[in-house]
Amino acid sequence: LAELVLREDKDGWTVLTLNRPEKLNSLTVSLFKELRQHIIDLRDDDAVRCVVLRGAGKCFSAGHDLGDIAEGEDVPSAGWHSETLRLMEKLPKPVIAAVHGHCYTGALEVALAADFIVAADTARFGDTHAKWALTPVWGMSQRLPRRVGIATAKRLMFTADMIDANEAVRIGLAEYAVPLDQFDAEIEGLVARIIANSPFSNAANKQLLEATDMRPMDAGLQWEVMETAGIGPDMAERIAAFTKK
């Protein structure tokens, strides 16, 4: 059987590819099981300093497989999908969702669990839960308003509107958009800039930002000082290399 999530290790980073292109990478329990195992494997893999999540073929993912829903999925436990995405969100390294083509509903919930989204100009985003008389259980109600604001989240959820890459950038859902023919090169360049920096700092800063998100300013400032991860083991080497230039 074909792998439903491919792992490709590069020089200091890894690409995870949703791999059901004949089904527009629609999301099943089996696919999520493979994604979850990759996430667990990556958590303690110090050779990997950045992770890119993308889709094979025409799109990132058309969303949760409606056939699976209709047949009654055999989910390992209540909240298991959400827990899987939380594991990805808490990986101690940057995670980028590289989105081209469709990114709807469950797929958008997956992309929102990355640290940020970069879009190809072909990307289309939407939340269609309301179209199918469903409500989100993979994190949409929490991550979407944190990303775009509660009013915009309500508009997208109430209307089930599809938005293009430019609109996604305008509302803050995606960081920026690039032409599809430049997409791979852009992602590689972005990753290169990330992994050139200290993996210690990237992990510590990710944890700091998450721990203090939505805290009152004074509480956040206190946390930054009192809970600091301190100085990384590569600090002296990095400063010495810079001063020798």
Where are these regions (language model features)?
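A general structural signal for well-ordered alpha-helical segments in protein cores
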Residues: 11, 66, 81, 141, ...
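Crotonase-fold acyl-CoA enzyme core
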Residues: 86-200
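Charged catalytic carboxylate motif
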Residues: 30, 34, 80, 87, ...
